[in-house]
Amino acid sequence: PEVKIGVVAVSRDCFPESLSVNRRKALMKAYTEKYGADSVYECPVCIVESEIHMVQALEDIKKAGCNALCVYLGNFGPEISETLLAKHFDGPAMFIAAAEETQNDLVGGRGDAYCGMLNASYNLKLRNIKAYIPENPVGTAAECADMLHEFIPIARAIVGLSDLKIISFGPRPLNFLACNAPIKQLYLSLIHISEPTRHAQ
């Protein structure tokens, strides 16, 4: 399947929203210059400690036809809103964060996204939300662009598996699931399993 990743930036009201927005723009610029714009969509909504913003962002990326999500911490993000976005989005999600570009502006230019990334991963676990986090999820715009591109085959596999239906060979009674196959992980991946019965046409 084709994958289109919606990139949503998040922020806190104790940090400049513009910092997160500008870092999102830098990420998108770095990505499109290296990989093109076909597989990504820049969501104009920046989530700033608001579940209203979260709903707006969710509706926007759905309307844009996105089937994968990237939550981008341009600075210290809001744990509740950003993780709820991943929860309510019907598709694979990843989390990455912006590194500090310089040490010269630690008042208006300090985002502390590294700390926000730690809190995000903790809150994802608390809510039992599955999301992809790269091994080194904090980086420059160029590094985050590479992470975003590396997420595409992962997202494609998840999207493809979510629509998969396995028809195995019987015959067995209708709706009969035995313990002779490791099917739990398939069910957790939202894969349906069916067996044709002796009564099937």
Question: What is each of the regions a protein language model found here?
Answer:
Residues M28-I47, K130-N136, S194:
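Short beta-strand elements in bilobed, periplasmic/extracellular small-molecule ligand-binding domains
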Residues I191-Q201:
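Single conserved hydrophobic/aromatic residue that forms the stacking wall/gate
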Residues I47-S162, L174:
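Cofactor- and metal-binding active-site motifs of prokaryotic enzymes
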Residues N22-K25, L85-H88, A181-S189:
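Short, solvent-exposed amphipathic alpha-helical segments in soluble enzyme
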Residues R12-L27, V107-Y114, L174-N180:
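Glycine- and acidic-residue-enriched helix-capping/strand-helix junction motifs
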Residues V7, P153-N180, K184:
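Conserved anion/nucleotide-ligand pocket segment
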Residues P1-V21, D163-R172:
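Short beta-strand segments enriched in small/hydrophobic residues
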